[in-house]
Amino acid sequence: MDKQQEFVLRTLEERDIRFVRLWFTDVLGFLKSVAVAPAELEQAFDEGIGFDGSAIEGFARVYESDMIAKPDPATFQVLPWRAETPGTARMFCDILMPDGSPSFADPRYVLKRALARTSDLGFTFYTHPEIEFFLLKDRPLDGSRPTPADNSGYFDHTPTNVGMDFRRQAITMLESMGISVEFSHHEGAPGQQEIDLRYADALSTADNVMTFRLVMKQVALEQGVHATFMPKPFSEHPGSGMHTHLSLFEGDRNAFYESGAEYQLSKVGRSFIAGLLRHAAEISAVTNQWVNSYKRIWGGSERTAGAGGEAPSYICWGHNNRSALVRVPMYKPGKTGSARVEVRSLDSGANPYLSYAVLLAAGLKGIEEGYELPPGAEDDVWALSNAERRAMGIEPLPQNLGEALTLMEGSDLVAETLGEHVFDFFLRNKRQEWEEYRSEVTAFELRKNLPVL
């Protein structure tokens, strides 16, 4: 037994923790959990916990359903909303086959595989997400319009702003679980919040994002509201993104930094961005996996820009340009370790493991193939005409999930990154979602057409 496992078992005894929740994520990014008693944990570290993989979205067929969840002791944390005695803790799991080999259906393994390839190239991949979400007074299940929890706007600080107390309690919980927070504030739409997590290695960040979502929903329930990570719940307000800053390090050196280069951006950094741009359309179905995701991307960002609504619609990059898909942020002089790129397409409903894996694969492809970075866009891309964008070589992102899936289906990069099992399941599941949406007669159609046709 290693020291981390010993620490977990000792902590369970010292803090009177009677329940240990073992977490993992299905292919669509939904959190799954099984609780074990502390007495069973030593065996779980050695052998894992068996479960029916065919009951988990995208994991296995019924005739090959036996799977194992093996806890990762490095992810052990006590759940702060179960602080009373006896307490409850959690660990993330790796999903294995009965013979002990990794399950190709496990999103965490998909990311681990991508990170192993990155390590072979001499890099460490870091990510830093800015997570937006809405607080709602209600959560109607009949499809009717929800009500935001407040009427505040961008950076508003008012006594009636429910978000202030919410963010304070949520951040306290996150930090008690070892998840560091950099910033928090009210976003541009009524009820919309943003909390930015401190950068970490990509696997830790993905685990943190999954924890973050549960903490937000838990705190919201305690405060009598509801938290949603739906990309765009209101047609007239900005949607919720998960802008993510990416960087590669070689040891302690930031591989994106080069003194004297334009924007201090190294050849590695420029090729990484070029890879993100070249493969942006084909990875879009992963980073923006819901029908609703494309309402955020194409839902009038030019009208809501400056109010937190800068969702990118076009494939381009720019220096400090929030209308671009990829932004090279400014950073303070001397802070060379802060050199990074920001991808602005992700929404807060994405599976972080799969999203980080395909973003990394796209960037590494640019490095390995020596992609040349096209000229940057320093103007407001939304304000340009279609002809002006075409002249600059700026193409649009997919208009909807169906278009994104068609591009993904033809992508060798996405297929290789996700692996055959996840790739095939994802396409089947999302095609079904798209077909259901296409055949749905919407309230918009009834409202517009029924009175006049």
What annotation goes with each model-predicted range?
Residues M1-L453:
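Glycine-rich, acidic/polar active-site loops that bind/position phosphate-bearing ligands
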